[in-house]
């Protein structure tokens, strides 16, 4: 699989308490199937952070990768925006 075909997501770091692992919350807008209202749906991904670069509330870009552990299938590409 080429790197260009891998999924990428942008989200906010919710937790960085684990060593070399961050939890990223990704928000998507979904239309309700019956009522049509647009809702925010949040999904949490565990991502590999090799250098422990990301902090809580940072906006980050993550990319899909091979399974690194039981729950980690994503890795940190870059910190898009630092928390204030």
Curated annotation (Swiss-Prot):
Gene3D superfamilies: Nucleic acid-binding proteins. SUPFAM superfamilies: Nucleic acid-binding proteins. It holds the Pfam family Ribosomal_S17. It comes from the Bacteria. GO terms for cellular component: ribonucleoprotein complex; ribosome. GO terms for molecular function: rRNA binding; structural constituent of ribosome. Belongs to the universal ribosomal protein uS17 family. Part of the 30S ribosomal subunit. One of the primary rRNA binding proteins, it binds specifically to the 5'-end of 16S ribosomal RNA. This is Small ribosomal subunit protein uS17. It comes from Clostridium botulinum (strain Hall / ATCC 3502 / NCTC 13319 / Type A).
């Amino acid at each position: 699989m080429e790197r260009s075909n891998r999924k990428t997501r942008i989200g906010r770091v919710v937790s960085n308490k684990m060593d070399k692992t961050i939890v990223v919350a990704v928000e998507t807008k979904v239309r309700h199937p019956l009522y049509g209202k647009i809702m925010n749906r949040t999904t949490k991904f565990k991502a590999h952070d090799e250098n422990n670069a990301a902090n809580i509330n940072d906006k980050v870009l993550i990319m899909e990768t091979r399974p690194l552990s039981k729950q980690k299938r994503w890795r940190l590409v870059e910190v898009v925006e630092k928390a204030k």
